UniProtKB/Swiss-Prot annotation:
Name of the protein in its database record: Protein RecA
Species: Pseudomonas fluorescens
Region Disordered, annotated ranges: 333-352
Family indicated by similarity: Belongs to the RecA family.
Cellular component, GO annotation: cytosol
Feature: compositional bias, Acidic residues: 343-352
Binding site for ATP: 65-72
Amino acid sequence: MDDNKKKALAAALGQIERQFGKGAVMRMGDHDRQAIPAISTGSLGLDIALGIGGLPKGRIVEIYGPESSGKTTLTLSVIAQAQKMGATCAFVDAEHALDPEYAGKLGVNVDDLLVSQPDTGEQALEITDMLVRSNAIDVIVVDSVAALVPKAEIEGEMGDMHVGLQARLMSQALRKITGNIKNANCLVIFINQIRMKIGVMFGSPETTTGGNALKFYASVRLDIRRTGAVKEGDEVVGSETRVKVVKNKVAPPFRQAEFQILYGKGIYLNGEMIDLGVLHGFVEKSGAWYAYNGSKIGQGKANSAKFLADNPDIVATLEKQIRDKLLTPAPDVKAAANREPVEEVEEADTDI
């Protein structure tokens, strides 16, 4: 860069800093690259599919799928994992359907969980924004976008037409809270429902509620589906679940994970650990027997999973081995610190 351009740039940067504050514009090379902090989903396979070990903090996440596919269960699992790390969590229950007893069975500390059951969509989103701006909340779940009913619709008659009202509400709210979410380093999860578009001849007729704004503002979008039933004899005790990462701004998208959700218990993590351990060579399988580090741990997947449940130390070791192999390592801070410094531009005294 020639001297005249350097002086012009320095003058512009100086004026910007005086007008908007220090840090309004900065060189990316002046700061070490930070790994994006993540909160585990409670599913090891899904954490790996997300690329960073969980859902990213400081971002918006959308989880959508058909009814009874496990959307709320997955978000409660995220809350349980966050609370284990000492995080403060909130649940904005726009559907008025949160079951504290079920949440407790999934590992959620319901005594410490903040819950709001707002009357209108405006109230729900305003409460969410105020919680974010407090800088004291780590995870907020909004259940669901479809239940964020605009005030005008509630006060109107049952047959009144309110075209695009909810979409405008979501668009305005997301414009307002996105920057606050980043500054507060808070994870905000929106649960959404599926609707069918009429008259679609080609492609999928499925769409989500609340317009297109959430699709743009979300850093991660998860499509969760129930693919089958988990049975013990003739009794159905859970569901086979597939989650596809349809959008990901923090890692490569379109990966997917499959796991089981057991009724009244949540995500079947130990069974998932057995499957991933066998797949990646950490657990040996011979016939119906499973072995770890040369020692047999059980006959059949169910017995092996029970062994893991009784031995949390082995679970922690196996999980670390799988994560170390499959997850991208964090940026090398030492290497970043040792790189050549970026040429600094001297600030000029003149104003533009």
